[in-house]
Amino acid sequence: MPESKLNSPLRYHGIYNAPHRAFLRSVGLTDGEINKPLVAVATAWSEAGPCNFHTLSLAHVAKEGAKEGGLTPLAFPTIVVNDNIGMGTEGMRYSLVSRDLIADMVEAQFNAHAFDALIGIGGCDKTTPGILMAMARLNVPSIYIYGGSAEPGFYLGRRLTIEDVHEAIGAFIAGKIDEHELYEIEKRAHPTVGTCSGMFTANTMGSMSEALGMALPGSASPTATSSRRIMYVRETGKAVSRLLENGVKSRDILTFEAFENAIAVLMAMGGSTNAVLHLLAIAYEAGVKLTLDDFNRISKRTPYIGSLKPGGDYVMADLDEVGGVPLVMKKLLDAGLLNGDVLTVTGKTMKQNLQEYRIPNVPHNHIVKDVKNPIKPRGGIVILKGSLAPEGAVIKVAATNVTKFEGKAKVYNSEEQAFKGIQSNEVKDGEVVVIRYEGPKGGPGMPEMLRVTAAIVGAGLSNVAMVTDGRFSGATRGPMVGHVAPEAMVGGPIAIVEDGDVIVIDVENERLDIKLSDAEIKRRLNNWSPPEPRYKSGLLAKYASLVAQSSMGAVTRPVIK
């Protein structure tokens, strides 16, 4: 990229920029280093949990790679909110909020210090989408590297993930296991640094970074403890110099076709429903018009082929051994289900990347099926619409075999109320648990309901469904419908559901309905008034005033009159 198009010369070159250069010298930069393009290494790092515990060391490796590529790298941090530690508490309300905060923080630090290019490193659920949103917003040469998943745990010969700990609580409540066994599962479920090992939200979004073309091929699947993780981080540092040299910016890669590819990979792998929110949000920042209808359109034509937890039997480390995300993408490309002509961070097309990537010559059909012999003929996520969700709702069909469910509503106005209801055996087989006022504005922050869904599964309530305007963890399984829009707080129909109302979940017809006449729904809505907001000051109150509905990715938007 010509110097005239770089940001850093305007800030650091020339006699009048001597004060700015003085501060770069203070951190050890030489004249030669100041005269090179400056690359930001945005790193989501935190000791509060294993997901991003190791990313600071990865940042040092990425910087080494960038230096080898002739650049001057400087690292800065972003915040991290650990979803698992916040699960079922007020802390979870900050999870989705942190995604947009991360995007804002990266934008602020990048522009304030006049960087020329961006390397992003993150490990958990919101760090990947937050950094990708910033890359899309900034539209500068950018590349992402995922921090990697943890190795799976083991207990009595059974492979464990964090999902098993949550479900063990439900089993304990139901008297199926004792406190000692719960404790043993807790100690063994997550034995190393890295993200949750199943195809939960973190690994889903790591996979999306590859599928979008924003990360090096094969870089999502090695575990956080793998030496190949270090190799990919170093190569990522080198690769950003080629993007700068060729003038390739993030929006050159983040096209509508790239998002179609990402959705296809999401559907094929049975990834997290949270990816729907995050892809919509990244597209919004990239100026790409992506809608929920695009997800259903691609879901219908894309088979579900990845047997990965929670819907299947395997974890990310297993997928890595047989070829990682490129194995899935190559199968889709060969079947005509991917656009191979899109540009990627390698400077090559997706098709060229997949042709050059060496898939291990080992059996893989137990993990990744053939497109012509899939686990299910349509993708792992379905968008539902109907009288209960006029703007849409999301169900992960990869994690349930239920295609139609009809039952009476058991209504709760918060996740906490619902969890207490399950503890006290209020919920009966055949019912639909409705949890409302947990949407983007109502939560606020659209918290995940894993504590409730895991308690339902763990308690053996196999014939219970759930509908919420909140979110689900990527570890959730069962007939669980989330992201109901409009949410209760803004007067969506979910606000007027009463105990005993009949709710119908119909996956085949993509419907979510309440068995009430239009006149009765209208009458109830006319008599409805919103509750007092849970927060009237602070970050959560500010967020609630700016956030859009889940059908729009729950992005925060400025209020411009």
UniProtKB/Swiss-Prot annotation:
Binds 1 [2Fe-2S] cluster per subunit. This cluster acts as a Lewis acid cofactor. It catalyses: (2R)-2,3-dihydroxy-3-methylbutanoate = 3-methyl-2-oxobutanoate + H2O; (2R,3R)-2,3-dihydroxy-3-methylpentanoate = (S)-3-methyl-2-oxopentanoate + H2O. SUPFAM superfamilies: IlvD/EDD N-terminal domain-like, LeuD/IlvD-like. Pathway: Amino-acid biosynthesis; L-isoleucine biosynthesis; L-isoleucine from 2-oxobutanoate: step 3/4; Amino-acid biosynthesis; L-valine biosynthesis; L-valine from pyruvate: step 3/4. InterPro entries: DHAD_IlvD/Edd, Dihydro-acid_dehy_C, DihydroxyA_deHydtase, DiOHA_6PGluconate_deHydtase_CS, ILV_EDD_C, ILV_EDD_N, IlvD/EDD_N. Its EC number is 4.2.1.9. Mg(2+) binds at residues 83, 125-126, 448. The keyword Iron applies. The active site is at 473 (proton acceptor). Its cofactor is [2Fe-2S] cluster; Mg(2+). Transmembrane segments: none annotated. [2Fe-2S] cluster binds at residues 51, 124, 196. Keywords: 2Fe-2S, Amino-acid biosynthesis, Branched-chain amino acid biosynthesis, Iron, Iron-sulfur, Lyase, Magnesium, Metal-binding. GO terms for molecular function: 2 iron, 2 sulfur cluster binding; dihydroxy-acid dehydratase activity; magnesium ion binding. The modification N6-carboxylysine is found at residue 126. It is an enzyme of class 4 (lyase). GO terms for biological process: isoleucine biosynthetic process; L-valine biosynthetic process. Belongs to the IlvD/Edd family. Homodimer. Functions in the biosynthesis of branched-chain amino acids. Catalyzes the dehydration of (2R,3R)-2,3-dihydroxy-3-methylpentanoate (2,3-dihydroxy-3-methylvalerate) into 2-oxo-3-methylpentanoate (2-oxo-3-methylvalerate) and of (2R)-2,3-dihydroxy-3-methylbutanoate (2,3-dihydroxyisovalerate) into 2-oxo-3-methylbutanoate (2-oxoisovalerate), the penultimate precursor to L-isoleucine and L-valine, respectively. This is Dihydroxy-acid dehydratase. The lineage of its organism: Archaea, Thermoproteota, Thermoprotei, Sulfolobales, Sulfolobaceae.
